[in-house]
A protein has these predicted regions:
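Single conserved hydrophobic/aromatic residue that forms the stacking wall/gate
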Residues: 1-6, 10-11
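Alpha-helix C-terminal capping/helix-to-coil transition sites in glycosyltransferase folds
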Residues: 5-6, 66, 119
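Conserved inter-motif catalytic segment of the P-loop NTP-binding fold
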Residues: 14-95, 128-129
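Phosphate-binding/switch region of NTP-binding enzymes
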Residues: 90-167
Length: 167
């Protein structure tokens, strides 16, 4: 799901390149195969897979014409504190950072990740191939289907779940 969101960011804004900082999976063959599997080859010149710790990423982002959108997988693998996050955000105010987090239920795992969630302008929880907005920028429905067939199978075939965590 995250890779498709990265692809969507590349497609929607042809002028920005997206860095997917895959600390958890790295730039392995698995990641490359997923890129092909999800049809992201068409945006590959706008999407770069990297595996860099935060100090190295900061060096990259200080360069002229660096990435304007950075997806970080995952917040826990950065080993950042909330203070580290604030420093990153303040040093690069014109960059969009998307943090993927391990979860405990529908919330990020760990105090620092939870604090980042509360600071974020937009919070997105993904379940069953559907992304749900938890923030104030929800659009018409507050949800975005990432993969139609997967979402159909999960929500309609797998049992009586309620979309969006509604009971």
């Amino acid at each position: 799901g995250v890779r498709l969101v990265g692809s969507e960011m590349c497609i929607r804004d042809r002028y920005d390149r997206v860095a997917f900082n895959s600390l958890e999976e790295g730039t392995s063959l698995t990641v490359q195969n997923n890129l092909r599997r999800f049809g992201m080859a068409e945006v590959s010149r706008h999407l770069a897979f990297i595996k860099e710790d935060i100090p190295t990423l900061k060096i990259r982002l200080r360069r002229h014409k660096s990435f304007n959108i950075v997806i970080i997988d995952s917040f826990q693998y950065t080993q950042m504190t909330y203070r580290d996050y604030i420093q990153l955000k303040e040093e690069f105010p014109d960059k969009l950072f998307v943090f993927i987090s391990h979860a405990r239920g529908k919330n990020p795992k760990g105090d620092a990740a939870t604090s980042v969630m509360y600071d974020a302008d937009l919070k997105i929880w993904v379940e069953g191939y559907v992304a749900f907005s938890k923030g104030r920028y929800q659009g018409a429905t507050g949800e975005y289907t990432i993969w139609e067939k997967g979402a159909y199978d999960y929500w309609n075939v797998a049992g009586p779940k309620q979309k969006g965590g509604q009971a």
